[in-house]
Amino acid sequence: MTNLLKKFNEQQMQVLAKEIPEFRPGDDLKVTFKVVDGTSERIQIFEGVCISKRNRGLHSSFAVRKVSHGESIVSQFFVYSPALVSVQVTRKGKVRRAKLYYLCKLFGKAARIKERTTYVKKKSK
């Protein structure tokens, strides 16, 4: 029985696969998704910090936090959802935790995350 579910999930993941860049908690993301209001459909952009990532095959998801008008908003997105259009990494953050739920209580400068720098090794002669 579990093999049937596993095969079904793998098939659905291949059908719903999208080009999503690799990102980690602490990274600033720009998520574009479809919103359906009755009969009309529009595209909305949600920019914020990734505070968690959940890798569970077809049920994989990630949470993004942004501050709007002084209020903290956390939105959960499913990776294989047909409503998800694209994800862009705008800035890479340096954090030491996998889940950054403590950021929800912080505002302003206290909620800042340092930028992660990547170094390229030079080939020696």
Swiss-Prot record:
A single BP term in Gene Ontology: translation
InterPro entries named in the record: Ribosomal_bL19, Ribosomal_bL19_sf, Translation_prot_SH3-like_sf
Claim: Amino-acid biosynthesis is one of the keywords in the record: no
Coiled-coil segments on the chain, per record: none
Gene3D superfamilies, per the entry: 2.30.30.790
Primary role: This protein is located at the 30S-50S ribosomal subunit interface and may play a role in the structure and function of the aminoacyl-tRNA binding site.
Family label: Belongs to the bacterial ribosomal protein bL19 family.
Protein name, entry field: Large ribosomal subunit protein bL19
Gene name per UniProt: rplS
